[in-house]
């Protein structure tokens, strides 16, 4: 399993609207897997693979092929610089959903036109030694956090400007069968969009459908790149690839866990944005059973993902979500199980040749 690629994807900074570094990495990885690639006006990378006959040769039929679109968003939650004050403190505005309880004492990377600068993020206020009990027990709002990059104020003001972006700065780690990193939401999907097609390509299996993999932008702020990409592609089938919750940890009732690590990929039934097509659910389930690929059915009470955009584009499409359970989501210690990741890759690669 190509974990090195997953690490590189996760460690590459790219917040909503500034995914270009992630896109450039993906463009290098997908060479030879697709017949056409282009970048749309929203910055999404649209990759087309035409139908294939025996031994992987491009097959030209007399009828228009079924178009299957895989949607994999590139952006991670992060921040934009909103102000640099006269003391050199950097203030930020979130791009995506943060829980302020997870922002204390974090190392960050401030990405500017003048280079990337390491910094630390903390809330304003007194340290524990001199703070009152009330101050210690109060969780600050996100807007109270600032960044210190350790440079004189005049240099900070010359170097960092409003609109520069900020990501968490932590390396990806392997821990047994787990991978821990920032940005697994949703570089997991980027990895799957590459590796599932790589597995399909190396298998030499024929597929009658046209496969479009869209590495989309700005999902974390409203599925924006997926909406425009889906409208342009107008797929017959949309597969939203994403992470989902794995709350199989202390403090959460078992019935609320959503997924459990090590039990396979998630066959996504519904969330707050769309309901998966029943026939597609049955088809993926049949493929998983045939190939003995572990899976678990999942329902997420809220939230959304790019599959919704494909389902609602133009005249509409049949859509489904394929997801990977992730612990500690939207933190710098997001955790997946590589067995679940491999299962998601395998089921996508096995499903595509079944589409007429």
Residue spans for each PLM region:
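N-terminal hydrophobic/helix-forming segments and targeting peptides
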Residues: 1-356
């Amino acid at each position: 399993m190509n974990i090195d690629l997953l690490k590189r994807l996760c460690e590459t900074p790219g917040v909503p609207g500034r995914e270009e570094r992630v896109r450039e990495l993906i463009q290098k990885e997908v060479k030879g897997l697709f017949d056409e690639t282009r970048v749309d006006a929203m910055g999404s990378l649209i990759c087309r693979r035409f139908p294939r006959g025996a031994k992987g040769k491009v097959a030209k039929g007399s009828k228009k092929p079924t178009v299957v679109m895989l949607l994999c968003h590139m952006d991670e939650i992060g921040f934009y610089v909103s102000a640099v004050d006269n003391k050199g403190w950097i203030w930020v505005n979130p791009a995506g959903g943060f829980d302020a309880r997870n922002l204390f004492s974090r190392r960050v990377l401030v990405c500017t036109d003048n280079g990337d600068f390491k910094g630390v993020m903390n809330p304003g206020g007194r340290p524990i030694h001199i703070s009152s009990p009330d101050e210690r027990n109060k969780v600050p709002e996100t807007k109270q956090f600032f960044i210190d990059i350790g440079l004189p104020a005049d240099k900070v003001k010359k170097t960092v400007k409003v609109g520069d972006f900020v990501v968490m700065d932590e390396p990806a780690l392997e821990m047994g069968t787990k991978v821990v990193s920032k940005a697994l939401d949703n570089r997991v999907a980027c990895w799957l969009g590459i590796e599932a097609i790589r597995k399909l390509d190396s298998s030499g299996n024929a597929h009658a459908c046209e496969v479009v993999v869209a590495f989309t932008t700005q999902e974390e702020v409203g599925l924006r790149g997926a909406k425009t990409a889906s409208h342009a592609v107008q797929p017959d089938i949309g597969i939203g690839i994403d992470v989902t919750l794995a709350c199989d940890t202390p403090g959460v009732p078992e019935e609320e866990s959503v997924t459990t690590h090590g039990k396979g990929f998630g066959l996504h039934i519904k969330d707050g944005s769309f309901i998966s097509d029943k026939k597609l659910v049955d088809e993926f389930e049949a493929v998983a059973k045939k190939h003995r690929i572990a899976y678990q059915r999942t329902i997420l009470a809220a939230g959304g993902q790019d599959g919704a955009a494909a389902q609602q584009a133009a005249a509409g499409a049949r859509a489904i979500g394929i997801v990977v359970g992730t612990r500690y989501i939207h933190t710098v210690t997001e955790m997946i199980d590589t067995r679940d990741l491999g299962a998601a890759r395998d089921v996508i690669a096995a499903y595509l040749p079944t589409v007429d």
